């Protein structure tokens, strides 16, 4: 992603973007190593089915969600349509992969007679995932489907941005709750695994902090291209019936 920033005078933003990519890959590598080696790999059935859940949630709700949030900061010369499509595709990938993780843990609980939805992790997780689905549906309806009034899009955009960031941070917090729940009774008997999981938790927090900082910098926001400004005003005139010169 950082190559798209090379021609921009954006201070140290390219280094933060590069750092976020390294952190994201490190999170996935540590999660995979933990589950594949110390938790004895992955299976879709039996006692190892649970291992599918944390990998899918870290990949989907944390890494891919974070990548989707960075699209409008990183790709500054590509058309708005291209960046919008990439943003939406990354979110739908995150949604599908996370859905696999949710199904895996429910099936694992059912097969082993464990109760569902009893822990704080599960409550936060299902609320975050449900809101993520609603966020995607509403965002798709307003920003991808042609003909939606300019006023509705402009009014909802701040809420869309806020909930996107809030759900990303909520996903990281829920992941930390899940890691603690998984390892709570095993720290004393598996110290090496405990260190690895704690390291993963710290890296998840740093990954979230770096992306959150990039998103808070308004001066790093993607500027509209000249042709996009003209199209935006034409679209507003078409859907609202007013003239740009009247504003």
From Swiss-Prot:
Its EC number is 7.2.1.-. Its cofactor is heme b. Residues 1-9, 73-84, 146-158, 216-247 are cytoplasmic. The chain crosses the membrane at residues 10-30, 52-72, 85-105, 125-145, 159-179, 195-215. Heme b 2 binds at residues 73, 80, 87, 160, 221. Residues 31-51, 106-124, 180-194 are vesicular. Residues 19-216 form the Cytochrome b561 domain. It is found in: Cytoplasmic vesicle, Secretory vesicle, Chromaffin granule membrane. Specific to neuroendocrine tissues. Signal peptide: none annotated. One of its GO terms (cellular component) is chromaffin granule membrane. This is Transmembrane ascorbate-dependent reductase CYB561. The lineage of its organism: Eukaryota, Metazoa, Chordata, Craniata, Vertebrata.
């Amino acid at each position: 992603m950082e190559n798209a920033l090379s021609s921009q005078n954006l201070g140290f933003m390219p280094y933060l973007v590069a750092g976020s990519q390294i952190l994201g890959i490190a999170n996935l590598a540590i999660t995979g190593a933990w589950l594949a080696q110390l938790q004895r790999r992955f299976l879709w059935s039996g006692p190892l089915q649970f291992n599918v859940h944390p990998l899918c949630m870290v990949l989907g709700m944390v890494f891919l969600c974070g990548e989707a949030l960075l699209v409008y900061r990183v790709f500054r010369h590509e058309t708005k349509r291209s960046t919008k499509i990439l943003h939406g595709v990354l979110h739908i990938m995150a949604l599908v992969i996370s859905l696999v993780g949710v199904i895996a843990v429910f099936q694992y609980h059912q097969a082993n007679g464990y109760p569902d939805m009893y822990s704080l992790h599960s409550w936060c997780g299902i609320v975050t995932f449900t809101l993520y689905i609603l966020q995607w549906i509403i965002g798709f309806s307003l920003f991808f489907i042609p003909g939606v009034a300019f006023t509705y899009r402009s009014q909802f955009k701040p809420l869309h941005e806020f909930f996107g960031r809030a759900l990303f941070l909520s996903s990281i917090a829920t992941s930390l709750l899940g890691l603690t729940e998984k390892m709570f009774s095993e720290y004393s008997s598996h110290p090496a695994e405990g260190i690895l999981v704690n390291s993963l938790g710290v890296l998840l927090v740093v990954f979230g902090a770096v992306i959150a900082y990039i998103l808070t910098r308004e001066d790093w926001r993607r500027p509209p291209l000249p042709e996009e400004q003209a199209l935006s005003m034409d679209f507003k005139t078409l859907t609202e019936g007013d003239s740009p010169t009247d504003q």
